[in-house]
């Protein structure tokens, strides 16, 4: 029982530490990309190109829709 409690506490603290680190990032810009019949990889590559253009340290895709007019949104971080 003790081992399970320690394992659970360790996992929980790791999740809490990760979420704290993610919240510490400074938002640089919100972006949206779209393309006709694009694959997720194409949209993600476009987001990466925009992130490099703005010298973002990282980015996170916040939404993606793939159909005849594919779109994705992302947040760029300093």
Curated annotation (Swiss-Prot):
Tell me which family the UniProt entry assigns to this protein.
Belongs to the BhsA/McbA family.
Indicate where this protein resides in the cell.
Periplasm
- Primary location recorded for the protein, binned into one broad class: periplasm
Q: Which cysteines are joined by disulfide bonds?
A: none
Which UniProt keyword terms apply here? Periplasm, Signal, Stress response
Q: Give start-end of the signal peptide.
A: 1-22
Tell me, what's a Pfam family for it?
YdgH_BhsA-like
Task: Cite the NCBIfam families for this sequence.
Answer: peri_RclB
UniProt induction comment: Induced by RclR in response to hypochlorous acid (HOCl).
What the protein does? Probably involved in reactive chlorine species (RCS) stress resistance.
Gene deletion effect: Mutants are more sensitive to HOCl treatment than wild-type cells.
The protein's name is Uncharacterized protein RclB
Identify the SUPFAM superfamilies for this entry.
YdgH-like
GO terms for biological process? response to hypochlorite; response to stress
Q: Name one GO cellular component term.
A: periplasmic space
């Amino acid at each position: 029982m003790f081992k399970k409690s320690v394992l659970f506490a360790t996992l929980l603290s790791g999740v809490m530490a990760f979420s704290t680190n993610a919240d510490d990032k400074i938002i640089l810009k919100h972006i949206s990309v779209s393309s006709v019949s694009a694959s997720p990889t194409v949209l993600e590559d476009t987001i990466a190109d925009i992130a490099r253009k703005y010298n973002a340290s990282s980015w996170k895709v916040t939404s993606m829709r793939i159909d005849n007019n594919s779109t994705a949104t992302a947040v760029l971080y300093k």
